[in-house]
Regions:
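Helix-start (N-cap) detector for alpha-helical repeat units in TPR-like alpha-solenoids
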Residues: 1-2, 35-36, 69-70, 103-104
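Structural signature of tandem alpha-helical TPR/SEL1-like repeats
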Residues: 13-23, 47-60, 82-94, 116-121
Length: 121
């Protein structure tokens, strides 16, 4: 399984997203309870602009592992793209609760609040 994740990650680094999705899907089919395979595929869906599929996979990650702070941070990114700013802020707050020393939630929450201000002007 680790070999599949490594292969998929290499494909992502080469921007071969469709092939990476296939590899991560294979890992999911082999072990549908392995949260990290779902999270990797969610990341590739995000990178390829398929935010709805990314969110669906993130939901599965959090169903399997509710404290997966990486998935919560990814959920924040997805919700920014979907302009669901309040949901994005909540995702980052949850990530920060789980991993208090994580720096990105504070940075992203500040940026989201700026986006909200810009839209109300």
């Amino acid at each position: 399984m680790t070999l599949l994740l490594n292969k998929g990650s290499s494909l992502v680094n080469e921007s071969k997203y469709n092939q990476a999705i296939d590899i991560f899907s294979k890992a999911i089919n082999l072990d549908p309870l392995w949260a990290e395979a779902w999270n990797k595929r969610a990341t590739v869906f995000y990178l390829s602009g398929n935010f709805e599929k990314s969110q669906k996979d993130i939901d599965k990650v959090l169903e399997l592992e509710k404290r997966h702070f990486g998935a919560l941070a990814g959920q924040g990114l997805v919700n920014i793209q979907l302009k669901n700013y309040d949901k994005a802020i909540n995702s980052y707050k949850r990530a920060k609760e789980i991993y208090p020393s994580m720096k990105s939630p504070d940075i992203m929450i500040k940026q989201i609040k700026e986006l909200i201000k810009e839209q109300t002007i």
